[in-house]
Regions:
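Short internal loop-to-helix segment that lines adenine-nucleotide cofactor pockets
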Residues: 54-75, 144-147, 176, 190-243, ...
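Short, conserved loop/helix-junction motifs that constitute active-site signature segments
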Residues: 90, 236-244, 270-273
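Conserved Class I S-adenosyl-L-methionine
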Residues: 263-276
Length: 338
């Protein structure tokens, strides 16, 4: 694929580069206000709500805190990559990024998204919120991470990116997952009980342990796997002990319950088993060693003390345009997984 300069940005042309996806009526190519491009499922409205139009990167507040923790990240591992939305942003500042996604159809979109965005230069803003339409203004500086001098960090994907079409867990093997056609972010490995109840299509996936890859210089691990976070951590324990990365986990209590553990088990892994970690929210606040619900916050960051102590503290709540999100009622959210 040729490299496209910012003057050549044309979403209609980019669609033609992937004729199979373009012909698939269940897929569409969308973009956010910074020009980042995503092949997604057309019937999954959450993708447009989270990724497109006036939005910056999904969960930009988490990205900003992770980059603040690790301004010179060497290797970042993205577990539960989905369509590579986070993988692509990690690639703007890390040296190496590994993305893991077990669902074949999702993995295919992630591959296309990484390939396309690696070849497209971005400059300015690509969406006019006042006109509610796509419009490129190359002179309107934009991005999701600001340096102290108020300039935006580059959106160029400069990292060496490796994508893996497998799942991760505490043991290697073949597992079954269920496919949520209108919300693929909820695809998950099935417990024995769930296998008897699921109404969704079931498919087999290969699962390895993260430790089996023997990755070096792992500075960050992000895990968002619909309740399977703790088994993944257990299969990554040697890597965590050896590399002492910042670990970002999505934690929903009801999802943990499905797999027979509690959020506190993950807190104890870092604070009692590994040791010398600080648990924070996306603003860097130390939230202690015990699990507690925080309204509107689903991710927790486990940060090595030697890293946390060096981070300049700034608890500003100012957000860039498009990053505002309605507060999530986590109790209602969790009821969906009972």
């Amino acid at each position: 694929m040729k490299n496209y300069k910012w003057q050549e940005w044309d979403i209609n042309h980019f669609k033609t580069l992937y004729p199979q996806l373009q012909a698939d009526t269940t897929k569409e190519l969308i973009h956010n206000r910074m020009g980042r491009l995503y092949w997604v499922w057309k019937d999954d409205a959450l993708y447009v709500q989270r990724f497109a139009r006036e939005n910056g990167p999904y969960q930009g507040r988490n990205l900003k805190w992770l980059r603040k923790c690790l301004p010179n990240a060497r290797t970042i591992v993205d577990v539960g990559m989905n369509v590579a939305n986070n993988t692509m942003e990690y690639a703007t500042w890390a040296e190496t990024v590994h993305g893991f996604e077990p669902t074949p159809s999702t993995f295919a979109l992630a591959e296309a998204n990484v390939e396309l965005n690696q070849h497209v230069e971005l400059k300015g803003r690509y969406y006019n919120s006042q006109k509610v339409m796509s419009e490129h203004d190359p002179d309107h500086a934009d991005g999701w991470y600001k340096f102290p001098d108020k300039t935006f960090a580059s959106l160029t994907m400069s990292a060496d990116v490796h994508l893996h079409n497998v799942g991760l867990g505490d043991v290697a093997g073949s597992f079954q997952m269920e496919d949520h056609p209108n919300n693929v972010g909820h695809n998950c490995i099935l417990t024995e009980e769930r296998k008897q109840k699921t109404k969704y299509e079931v498919y087999d996936v290969t699962v390895n342990t993260l430790d089996s890859y023997n990755f070096e210089n792992v500075d960050a691990i992000k895990v968002d796997c619909e309740g399977y976070e703790y088994p993944i951590l257990k299969g990554a324990l040697q890597t965590i002990q050896r590399c002492r990365p910042v670990v970002q986990l999505e934690i929903v209590e009801a999802q943990c319950k499905k797999f027979g553990y509690t959020p506190q088990d993950m807190f104890d892994l870092f604070h009692k088993q590994v040791g010398n970690y600080v648990t924070t929210d996306f603003q860097g606040n130390d939230i202690g060693t015990d699990w507690q619900r925080i309204k509107g916050v689903m991710d927790r960051f486990f940060v090595p003390k030697e890293i946390y102590q060096k981070i300049p503290k700034d608890n500003s709540k100012v957000r860039h345009p498009g990053m505002e999100r309605p507060q999530i009622n986590e109790e209602i959210f969790e009821e969906l997984f009972e």
